[in-house]
Amino acid sequence: KDYDNSDKNFPVIYMHDAQNLFDKKTSFAGEWEVDETLNKMNAQLIIIGIEHGNDKRIDELTPFTNEKYGGGNGENYVRFIIKTLKPKVDSLYRTKSNAKNTAIFGSSLGGLISFYAVIKHPNVFGKAGVFSPSFWFSDEVYSLMEKSETSKAKIFFLCGDKENETMVSDLKKMQTLLDRNRCYCLKL
């Protein structure tokens, strides 16, 4: 909000599925109203919305493969954010570029890839918003967590009260692993 009227640097949140973030005309299942919400909160940060490749969404947002759905190119997508997009954003805008001030948010498959990114690359992403994550896509996500190094990343999990039982149990399972394996999570 105050970007044009100051010379301060701002934290950055990278959000997946940009088609759904700002405009109901471009959204698949309803606008998230990110801009309206941040204005109401008077939040001083930069949001970078990353559009998905439509029929490539499953490939882009899944770090593991699934026998039925395929996927598995998520690391390439995350690497694009780290090696190409983030450096460009940091060079064009006044950002606070350290991990503490860089977050990654998403829902469903976007939640899965956000979780993966913050666990695999905590030196880049210090925070993650993981909303209704598709942990069902592959059990490898649990192995990843168990094998990961100690992290000071902050992870915010969210799922709605109308989610199916699998979503809630998957989130609780992951929260237990995170609590046991050294991560700082805001509770469900």
Please give the residue ranges for each predicted region:
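Non-catalytic cap/lid and distal C-terminal segments of serine-dependent acyl enzymes
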Residues: 1-188
